[in-house]
Amino acid sequence: MGHAMNAGTSPIANMGRLAGKQILVLNWRDIKHSQAGGAEQYMHQISARWVEAGAKVTWFTGHQPGQSAEDFLDGIRILRSGGTLGVYAQAARKLLQTGSLYDAVVDCQNGIPFFSPAFLPRRIPVVQLIHHVHQEQFRSRFSAPMAAVGRFLENTGAKAVYGQRAIAAVSPSTRLELRKLGFRGPVHVVPNGTIEVPQTVGPRDPEPTIAVVSRLVRHKRMDLLLGQLAVAARSIPRLRLEVMGDGPERARLQQLATDLGLDDTVTFHGYQPNAQRNALLSRAWVTASTSAAEGWGCSVIEAAAWGVPCMALRVPGIRDSVVEGRTGWLVDTAREFGPALVTALETMANPNKAREISAQCQQWARCFTWDRSAELLAGVVLEEELRLQGAEEAASSDMATLIRFPAPVAADLSSVVRPTDEIAENNGEVSLLMKGKDEFEAFALLKRVGVLNVQLRPAGRSMLLAGPGSAFAAEAG
């Protein structure tokens, strides 16, 4: 029997195979926590889809004053115990008492791991979910002794406890940082989803406008953006910056804007509900990022959904989210940022060029759906389960290969594709993204099942992120 395929990008259908399974998610916060952010939203969106597919998902997370000890959100059971650090000890107790009742554990690491394999039977699949590596943040935010402890736990301690257990990273940049730390097990890329791409956008503001959605915290380096905005404002009359978001840096940044003579240029809106935020984004010419590093540029992709390109520094996470020359522009140093911002705004002043770039931004954003993210992470869980059962070897490398061949497929592909692979059929052609395989390994597997008329190429960063069914990624590589 041939392998079933749907038009467009799809992982090998995985969520249905989680039906009936008890899955435990360990996270230090849930989405109702006052400091919840993108990491919590990521796992919540995926968990809700797993529940819809028939899985039974329980979160064990930290407790904040005013929160109940147990809750149900979107079909997800939430258990809360312990504070910011106490949650780790409480999670260990929970795993020792009831861990054997679960079919799989997703261990969300936010700098400090839960070390769940130490408290679970070996047979239970554990997938560590990592958004970004915190080694530099430990150095910059904590005293030397505390920073040393944090770096040890995230690096040496985690490698010792998790060993060859699977990791899901949200971007190629995060995977690269993990490899630099010496993690040698399989690291799968599972990008974030984003908002639904609107059918129509605009009209754009008649004046050159930059819209930024960001928490106002130190590592976002909004002060750098303000400094470079002062440079750009000399060349761009009536330039505007709309800042949406709040945080401990707000008062300092407002004073800096005053000191730079930008009071008439910059508006700090604070936190904005979705409707107001979207209205401001849809009118923007560009968005901007001067962050030191990210796991993934969530706000960059949200802006792209509204057809807004990004001017950014080439840093981890952001360089994955911006396709240079198509959905934005990247520079290597802060000194280059101001002049490049001027060039970007001048480009967007051309209506024809602006329409072209806006269309490419939206095409890129359409690649990132929460349904696909949920399928991909389910695939990582299933692949780890097969590995522990001895039915499948771990991915041997971080390489990925795109294979194209004519449809329909007479061969049974089920013996050669893995749960983490993706397959699509469009216009009489099958596109298969095989992960952990180079071109020679991929061809050998397909030859084994009689698929010989193939075209193979290494899959680049954009292809890996967007999936094989995306014409955008096929062109971008």
Regions found by a protein language model. Give the residues of each.
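Conserved acidic donor-binding segment of nucleotide-sugar-dependent glycosyltransferases
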Residues: 324-325, 329-335, 344-349
